[in-house]
UniProtKB/Swiss-Prot annotation:
Protein name per its UniProtKB record: Outer spore wall protein 5
Biased composition (Polar residues): 70-87
TM regions (residue ranges): 2-22, 25-45
Localisation: Membrane
Top-rank lineage group of the source organism: Eukaryota
Cytoplasmic side: 1, 46-135
Keyword Transmembrane helix included in the entry's annotation: yes
Gene designation: OSW5
Keyword Zinc: no
Length: 135
């Protein structure tokens, strides 16, 4: 003969199992969806890092090529001016612009205003520890 406490135990145990089964119908699919979203975050983070590094290297190569081309153009222009220096009249002096400027015209204290061989974007990338900028 079963005592009253055994009957209560069976009622509580069966109700616990029923509630656990119903909860698992919700929890297990939600855990699966959460796992899929977490995996997507990791995959997209990896792809983002790869595309950033590719774009950064493409930018640095293009920036270097552009600076090299502009430097060659500048050297060519200087060479052309030097070869024609004896034949051409002296250049006329250009009017100065500074007297026409206002009182705050010479205020320009931007950080990184020193001359550099890299562009402003490449200089900002030099500050990152995980990025290596090469010329």
């Amino acid at each position: 003969m079963a005592t009253l406490s055994s009957v209560y135990f069976l009622i509580y145990f069966v109700s616990f199992l029923a509630i656990a089964a119903v909860a698992s119908f919700f929890i297990i699919p939600l855990l699966g969806i959460s796992f899929l979203f977490a995996s997507a975050v990791v995959v997209f983070g990896f792809l983002s890092d790869i595309t950033f590094k590719f774009a950064q290297s493409l930018y640095i190569k293009t920036d270097h090529r552009l600076k090299s081309t502009l430097s060659k153009m500048g050297n060519q222009k200087k060479g052309t001016n030097n070869s024609q220096a004896g034949n051409s009249p002296p250049p006329t002096p250009q009017p100065s612009v500074e007297p026409q400027l206002g009182p705050n015209a010479n205020v320009w204290d931007a950080p990184g205003a020193e001359t550099s061989t890299t562009s402003a974007i490449a200089r900002s990338l030099e500050a990152r520890e995980d990025v290596r900028v090469t010329n």
